[in-house]
Amino acid sequence: MIVGIGIDLIELKRIEAAFARQPRFPGRVLTSYEQDQMAQLAPNRQIEYLAGRFAAKEAFAKAKGTGIGAGLSWHDIEIRTEGSGKPYIVVNDDSARVHLSITHSKEYAAAQVVIET
C-alpha cells in the first residue's frame, strides 16, 4: 500500500550559488559516502549530483510527511546507486519500501519518491 508520495524540483543555478557562497554546503546535505562519490565526478557533473541528491532527500521528506527538520536530517537519508545506475534510498531505522527516481536537465534536477508499507 502506498503511504506517501513526494516530488521535488530544484534549479541547478540555486545549488551552484549555494555551493559558491558556502563551500561546506555539500557536507551539510550529503553523507560521507555521498561526498566521496561526488568528489570522483568531473566538476561540471558535481552540481548535477548535488542537486539530484538534494531533490531526492527533499522528495523523501515530503513523502514521509515530515520535511527536513528536528525528526529527519539530511544525513539520515543516503542515496546510493545500484550497478545498473538505478538510485535507491538508505534510511536509518526505516522498514518501508522506498522507490526513487532522479532526473537532470541542463537547468533542473528533479526527484520523485514513493513509499510503500
From Swiss-Prot:
Cofactors required: Mg(2+)
Enzymatic reactions: apo-[ACP] + CoA = holo-[ACP] + adenosine 3',5'-bisphosphate + H(+)
Primary subcellular site in the record, as a coarse category: cytoplasm
Sites where the protein binds Mg(2+): 8, 58
Cellular component terms (Gene Ontology): cytosol
Record flagged with keyword Calcium: no
Enzyme Commission number, as recorded: 2.7.8.7
An annotated Gene Ontology molecular function: magnesium ion binding
Compartments, as annotated in UniProt: Cytoplasm
Keywords assigned: Cytoplasm, Fatty acid biosynthesis, Fatty acid metabolism, Lipid biosynthesis, Lipid metabolism, Magnesium, Metal-binding, Transferase
Assigned protein family: Belongs to the P-Pant transferase superfamily. AcpS family.
PANTHER family (UniProt xref): L-AMINOADIPATE-SEMIALDEHYDE DEHYDROGENASE-PHOSPHOPANTETHEINYL TRANSFERASE, PHOSPHOPANTETHEINE TRANSFERASE
Role: Transfers the 4'-phosphopantetheine moiety from coenzyme A to a Ser of acyl-carrier-protein.
Protein name, entry field: Holo-[acyl-carrier-protein] synthase
